[in-house]
Amino acid sequence: MKSLVLLAILAALAVVTLCYESHESMESYELNPFINRRNANIFISPQQRWRAKVQERIRERSKPVHELNREACDDYRLCERYAMVYGYNAAYNRYFRERRGAK
């Protein structure tokens, strides 16, 4: 009987210890944690923003071949359905490579 009471007390202590809710885990105590766009843009300097835009434009111009093929396949519904089953490479080869060879 004593061991059962001791086990119950230990279990209660374990529950209290493990289920303790820490206030440190709360995201924010602030009333309004969001900031407006003007203040948010202060974090990134104009030069970094310009550099990011230039890099994005370069990536748009020089896309990999498989990405261009996938975009072409996404525009054609039958190719897109075929790609869901067999993959984009097989779908592109079926619907677009044959047309190039026929020319």
Swiss-Prot record:
Protein name per Swiss-Prot or TrEMBL: Matrix Gla protein
UniProt domain Gla: residue ranges: 51-97
Function statement: Associates with the organic matrix of bone and cartilage. Thought to act as an inhibitor of bone formation.
Residue ranges of the propeptide: 97-103
Signal peptide: 1-19
Compartmental location: Secreted
Alphabetized UniProt keyword annotations: Chondrogenesis, Developmental protein, Differentiation, Disulfide bond, Gamma-carboxyglutamic acid, Osteogenesis, Phosphoprotein, Secreted, Signal
Record GO cellular component, one term: extracellular region
